[in-house]
Amino acid sequence: MTKSIAFIGVGNMGCPMAENIMKAGKSLKVFDVSEKMLEFAKNKNLETVSSLDELITVDVETVITMLPEGKHSKEVYLGERGIINKVSKNCLLIDCSTIDIQTSIEIGKKALELGIKMIDAPVSGGVMGAQKATLNIMVGGSKEAFDKAFPLLKIMGKNIFHAGDLGSGNGAKICNNMALGIAMIAASESLMLAKRLNIDIKKVHEIMKNASGNSWPISVYPPLPGLIDGTPSNNNYRPGFSAGMMNKDLKLANDCAKSVNAETPLGKMALEIYDQFCKEGNDTKDFSAISKVIGGSAWDYPID
Protein backbone atom coordinates (compact mmCIF):
# COMPACT_ATOMS: atom_id res chain seq x y z
CA MET A 1 0.00 0.00 0.00
CA THR A 2 1.35 3.44 -0.96
CA LYS A 3 1.86 5.63 2.07
CA SER A 4 0.33 9.08 1.85
CA ILE A 5 0.43 12.50 3.46
CA ALA A 6 -2.64 14.32 4.78
CA PHE A 7 -2.48 18.13 4.76
CA ILE A 8 -5.05 20.14 6.74
CA GLY A 9 -5.34 23.88 6.13
CA VAL A 10 -4.61 25.06 2.60
CA GLY A 11 -4.84 28.82 2.97
CA ASN A 12 -2.33 31.44 1.84
CA MET A 13 0.56 29.53 3.40
CA GLY A 14 -0.68 25.96 3.48
CA CYS A 15 -1.57 25.70 -0.19
CA PRO A 16 1.90 26.49 -1.60
CA MET A 17 3.48 24.27 1.05
CA ALA A 18 1.24 21.40 -0.04
CA GLU A 19 2.02 22.18 -3.68
CA ASN A 20 5.73 21.73 -3.06
CA ILE A 21 5.11 18.35 -1.46
CA MET A 22 3.03 17.31 -4.47
CA LYS A 23 5.73 18.54 -6.87
CA ALA A 24 8.25 16.41 -4.99
CA GLY A 25 6.28 13.35 -6.08
CA LYS A 26 4.64 12.54 -2.75
CA SER A 27 1.17 11.03 -2.48
CA LEU A 28 -0.88 13.81 -0.92
CA LYS A 29 -4.48 14.68 -0.06
CA VAL A 30 -5.64 18.00 1.40
CA PHE A 31 -8.59 19.29 3.40
CA ASP A 32 -9.83 22.68 4.57
CA VAL A 33 -13.07 23.73 6.25
CA SER A 34 -13.31 26.56 3.74
CA GLU A 35 -14.88 25.50 0.45
CA LYS A 36 -13.22 28.51 -1.17
CA MET A 37 -9.78 27.30 -0.09
CA LEU A 38 -10.55 23.75 -1.22
CA GLU A 39 -11.58 25.02 -4.64
CA PHE A 40 -8.40 27.09 -4.82
CA ALA A 41 -6.33 24.01 -3.92
CA LYS A 42 -8.15 21.95 -6.54
CA ASN A 43 -7.27 24.57 -9.15
CA LYS A 44 -3.64 24.05 -8.16
CA ASN A 45 -4.05 20.34 -9.05
CA LEU A 46 -4.03 19.23 -5.42
CA GLU A 47 -6.19 16.22 -4.57
CA THR A 48 -8.90 17.43 -2.19
CA VAL A 49 -11.32 15.63 0.11
CA SER A 50 -14.51 16.93 1.73
CA SER A 51 -14.02 15.80 5.34
CA LEU A 52 -11.45 14.76 7.93
CA ASP A 53 -12.97 11.28 7.96
CA GLU A 54 -12.25 10.98 4.26
CA LEU A 55 -8.75 12.39 4.73
CA ILE A 56 -7.49 10.21 7.59
CA THR A 57 -7.28 6.74 6.10
CA VAL A 58 -5.17 3.71 6.99
CA ASP A 59 -2.49 4.59 4.45
CA VAL A 60 -1.72 8.01 5.98
CA GLU A 61 1.79 8.03 7.45
CA THR A 62 2.10 11.78 8.03
CA VAL A 63 -0.37 14.52 8.93
CA ILE A 64 0.58 18.18 8.45
CA THR A 65 -1.60 20.95 9.83
CA MET A 66 -1.39 24.67 9.00
CA LEU A 67 -4.13 26.39 11.00
CA PRO A 68 -4.81 29.96 12.18
CA GLU A 69 -4.97 29.61 15.98
CA GLY A 70 -4.51 27.24 18.89
CA LYS A 71 -8.24 26.61 19.19
CA HIS A 72 -8.28 25.31 15.62
CA SER A 73 -5.32 22.98 16.19
CA LYS A 74 -6.89 21.71 19.40
CA GLU A 75 -10.20 21.02 17.67
CA VAL A 76 -8.57 19.21 14.74
CA TYR A 77 -6.38 17.02 16.95
CA LEU A 78 -8.32 16.64 20.21
CA GLY A 79 -11.90 17.63 19.39
CA GLU A 80 -14.95 15.39 19.28
CA ARG A 81 -13.97 14.28 15.77
CA GLY A 82 -10.27 14.85 16.34
CA ILE A 83 -7.69 12.95 14.34
CA ILE A 84 -5.50 11.95 17.28
CA ASN A 85 -7.59 8.81 17.84
CA LYS A 86 -7.86 8.01 14.13
CA VAL A 87 -4.24 7.89 13.00
CA SER A 88 -2.03 4.84 13.41
CA LYS A 89 0.79 4.72 15.96
CA ASN A 90 3.28 4.82 13.10
CA CYS A 91 1.90 8.15 11.90
CA LEU A 92 3.94 11.33 12.32
CA LEU A 93 2.05 14.51 13.26
CA ILE A 94 3.50 17.86 12.17
CA ASP A 95 1.72 21.01 13.32
CA CYS A 96 3.05 23.98 11.34
CA SER A 97 0.54 26.36 12.92
CA THR A 98 1.82 29.27 15.02
CA ILE A 99 -0.08 28.82 18.29
CA ASP A 100 0.33 29.31 22.03
CA ILE A 101 2.96 27.12 23.63
CA GLN A 102 0.57 25.62 26.20
CA THR A 103 -1.80 24.27 23.53
CA SER A 104 1.11 22.98 21.48
CA ILE A 105 2.45 21.02 24.45
CA GLU A 106 -1.03 19.75 25.39
CA ILE A 107 -1.62 18.29 21.94
CA GLY A 108 1.89 16.85 21.76
CA LYS A 109 1.65 15.17 25.15
CA LYS A 110 -1.64 13.52 24.22
CA ALA A 111 -0.03 12.17 21.06
CA LEU A 112 2.92 10.82 23.04
CA GLU A 113 0.55 9.12 25.50
CA LEU A 114 -0.87 7.23 22.52
CA GLY A 115 2.60 6.35 21.23
CA ILE A 116 2.42 8.78 18.31
CA LYS A 117 5.33 11.01 17.34
CA MET A 118 4.55 14.71 17.04
CA ILE A 119 6.41 17.96 16.48
CA ASP A 120 5.41 21.60 16.47
CA ALA A 121 6.99 23.16 13.38
CA PRO A 122 5.84 26.75 12.77
CA VAL A 123 7.29 28.50 9.75
CA SER A 124 8.64 31.92 8.85
CA GLY A 125 9.15 33.49 5.44
CA GLY A 126 5.67 34.46 4.31
CA VAL A 127 3.80 33.41 1.20
CA MET A 128 6.83 34.04 -1.01
CA GLY A 129 8.88 31.69 1.16
CA ALA A 130 6.13 29.07 1.02
CA GLN A 131 5.93 29.34 -2.76
CA LYS A 132 9.69 29.14 -3.25
CA ALA A 133 10.19 26.46 -0.55
CA THR A 134 12.61 28.76 1.28
CA LEU A 135 10.78 28.81 4.61
CA ASN A 136 12.55 28.81 7.94
CA ILE A 137 11.03 26.03 10.02
CA MET A 138 11.43 25.94 13.81
CA VAL A 139 10.83 22.54 15.35
CA GLY A 140 9.94 21.45 18.86
CA GLY A 141 9.92 17.76 19.73
CA SER A 142 12.17 14.76 20.26
CA LYS A 143 15.32 14.31 18.19
CA GLU A 144 13.85 11.07 16.83
CA ALA A 145 10.68 12.82 15.64
CA PHE A 146 12.72 15.70 14.21
CA ASP A 147 14.93 13.32 12.23
CA LYS A 148 11.90 11.47 10.90
CA ALA A 149 10.24 14.72 9.78
CA PHE A 150 13.38 16.36 8.38
CA PRO A 151 13.20 15.07 4.76
CA LEU A 152 9.61 16.28 4.43
CA LEU A 153 10.34 19.62 6.11
CA LYS A 154 13.24 20.10 3.72
CA ILE A 155 10.79 19.92 0.80
CA MET A 156 8.91 22.91 2.22
CA GLY A 157 11.75 24.95 3.67
CA LYS A 158 15.36 25.98 3.34
CA ASN A 159 16.51 26.32 6.95
CA ILE A 160 15.25 23.70 9.39
CA PHE A 161 16.02 24.26 13.08
CA HIS A 162 15.55 21.90 16.02
CA ALA A 163 14.73 24.38 18.79
CA GLY A 164 14.21 21.85 21.59
CA ASP A 165 11.37 19.95 23.26
CA LEU A 166 7.67 20.14 22.39
CA GLY A 167 6.52 23.75 22.31
CA SER A 168 10.00 25.11 21.63
CA GLY A 169 9.25 25.57 17.94
CA ASN A 170 6.34 27.84 18.73
CA GLY A 171 8.35 29.61 21.41
CA ALA A 172 11.11 30.39 18.92
CA LYS A 173 8.60 31.48 16.27
CA ILE A 174 6.81 33.81 18.69
CA CYS A 175 10.12 35.46 19.63
CA ASN A 176 11.02 35.81 15.95
CA ASN A 177 7.69 37.37 15.00
CA MET A 178 7.78 39.82 17.87
CA ALA A 179 11.12 41.05 16.48
CA LEU A 180 9.62 41.10 12.97
CA GLY A 181 6.64 43.21 14.01
CA ILE A 182 8.93 45.70 15.75
CA ALA A 183 11.25 45.77 12.72
CA MET A 184 8.39 46.43 10.28
CA ILE A 185 7.27 49.42 12.35
CA ALA A 186 10.88 50.66 12.51
CA ALA A 187 11.29 50.29 8.74
CA SER A 188 8.04 52.18 8.18
CA GLU A 189 9.09 54.98 10.53
CA SER A 190 12.48 55.35 8.83
CA LEU A 191 11.18 55.39 5.26
CA MET A 192 8.32 57.74 6.06
CA LEU A 193 10.71 60.09 7.87
CA ALA A 194 12.84 60.15 4.72
CA LYS A 195 9.71 60.99 2.74
CA ARG A 196 8.88 63.89 5.07
CA LEU A 197 12.46 65.10 4.64
CA ASN A 198 11.93 65.05 0.86
CA ILE A 199 14.74 62.54 0.32
CA ASP A 200 14.37 60.06 -2.55
CA ILE A 201 12.83 56.93 -0.99
CA LYS A 202 14.57 54.59 -3.43
CA LYS A 203 17.95 56.06 -2.56
CA VAL A 204 17.30 55.84 1.18
CA HIS A 205 16.13 52.25 0.74
CA GLU A 206 19.32 51.34 -1.14
CA ILE A 207 21.43 53.02 1.54
CA MET A 208 19.65 51.19 4.37
CA LYS A 209 19.99 47.83 2.59
CA ASN A 210 23.76 48.29 2.65
CA ALA A 211 24.15 50.03 5.99
CA SER A 212 23.66 49.23 9.67
CA GLY A 213 19.93 50.01 9.47
CA ASN A 214 19.25 46.96 7.32
CA SER A 215 16.61 44.42 8.34
CA TRP A 216 14.37 41.81 6.71
CA PRO A 217 11.56 44.35 6.16
CA ILE A 218 14.06 46.66 4.46
CA SER A 219 15.97 44.15 2.33
CA VAL A 220 13.22 41.66 1.46
CA TYR A 221 9.75 42.97 2.35
CA PRO A 222 9.68 46.79 2.30
CA PRO A 223 6.51 48.52 3.54
CA LEU A 224 6.37 51.07 0.71
CA PRO A 225 5.63 50.34 -2.97
CA GLY A 226 8.11 50.73 -5.78
CA LEU A 227 11.10 49.29 -3.94
CA ILE A 228 11.10 45.51 -4.53
CA ASP A 229 9.01 43.72 -7.17
CA GLY A 230 6.61 41.02 -6.03
CA THR A 231 6.09 42.33 -2.51
CA PRO A 232 2.62 43.00 -1.04
CA SER A 233 3.32 46.74 -0.96
CA ASN A 234 3.46 46.57 -4.77
CA ASN A 235 0.14 44.72 -4.90
CA ASN A 236 -2.16 47.01 -2.93
CA TYR A 237 -1.05 45.21 0.25
CA ARG A 238 -2.72 41.96 -0.69
CA PRO A 239 -1.61 39.79 2.22
CA GLY A 240 1.28 37.45 2.21
CA PHE A 241 1.15 37.67 6.00
CA SER A 242 -1.83 39.67 7.22
CA ALA A 243 -1.88 42.40 9.85
CA GLY A 244 -4.39 40.27 11.73
CA MET A 245 -1.95 37.36 11.90
CA MET A 246 0.86 39.64 13.06
CA ASN A 247 -1.45 41.05 15.71
CA LYS A 248 -2.22 37.49 16.84
CA ASP A 249 1.48 36.64 17.10
CA LEU A 250 2.26 39.82 19.04
CA LYS A 251 -0.53 38.89 21.47
CA LEU A 252 1.04 35.45 21.86
CA ALA A 253 4.41 37.09 22.56
CA ASN A 254 2.85 39.45 25.09
CA ASP A 255 1.12 36.55 26.85
CA CYS A 256 4.39 34.58 26.91
CA ALA A 257 6.24 37.56 28.36
CA LYS A 258 3.66 37.93 31.13
CA SER A 259 3.85 34.22 31.96
CA VAL A 260 7.60 34.38 32.63
CA ASN A 261 7.79 37.99 33.91
CA ALA A 262 9.85 39.14 30.92
CA GLU A 263 10.06 42.84 30.06
CA THR A 264 9.20 43.45 26.39
CA PRO A 265 8.33 47.17 26.12
CA LEU A 266 8.83 47.38 22.35
CA GLY A 267 6.85 44.20 21.82
CA LYS A 268 4.02 45.63 23.89
CA MET A 269 4.10 48.89 21.93
CA ALA A 270 4.10 47.00 18.61
CA LEU A 271 1.04 45.06 19.80
CA GLU A 272 -0.77 48.30 20.65
CA ILE A 273 0.00 49.73 17.19
CA TYR A 274 -1.09 46.61 15.28
CA ASP A 275 -4.12 46.08 17.48
CA GLN A 276 -5.40 49.58 16.73
CA PHE A 277 -4.60 49.13 13.03
CA CYS A 278 -6.70 45.96 12.93
CA LYS A 279 -9.56 47.56 14.85
CA GLU A 280 -9.69 50.20 12.12
CA GLY A 281 -10.54 47.47 9.61
CA ASN A 282 -7.09 46.68 8.22
CA ASP A 283 -6.70 43.15 9.60
CA THR A 284 -6.91 41.51 6.16
CA LYS A 285 -4.27 43.78 4.64
CA ASP A 286 -0.64 42.71 4.64
CA PHE A 287 1.19 43.53 7.86
CA SER A 288 3.52 45.84 5.92
CA ALA A 289 0.54 48.18 5.40
CA ILE A 290 1.21 49.38 8.95
CA SER A 291 3.23 52.08 7.18
CA LYS A 292 -0.12 53.76 6.47
CA VAL A 293 -0.45 54.50 10.19
CA ILE A 294 3.18 55.56 10.50
CA GLY A 295 2.93 57.81 7.46
CA GLY A 296 0.32 60.24 8.73
CA SER A 297 -0.16 63.18 6.38
CA ALA A 298 2.92 62.14 4.38
CA TRP A 299 1.13 59.00 3.14
CA ASP A 300 0.25 59.17 -0.54
CA TYR A 301 -0.04 55.44 -1.31
CA PRO A 302 -3.81 54.82 -0.97
CA ILE A 303 -5.02 51.32 -0.19
CA ASP A 304 -8.58 50.10 -0.71
List where the protein language model places each region.
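Rossmann-fold dinucleotide-binding core
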Residues: 8-10, 76, 99-177
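Hydrophobic beta-strand scaffold residues
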Residues: 28, 48, 118-119, 160, ...
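Rossmann-fold NAD(P) dinucleotide-binding segment
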Residues: 52-117
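Helical "substrate-binding/catalytic lid" subdomain
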Residues: 169-269, 273-297, 301
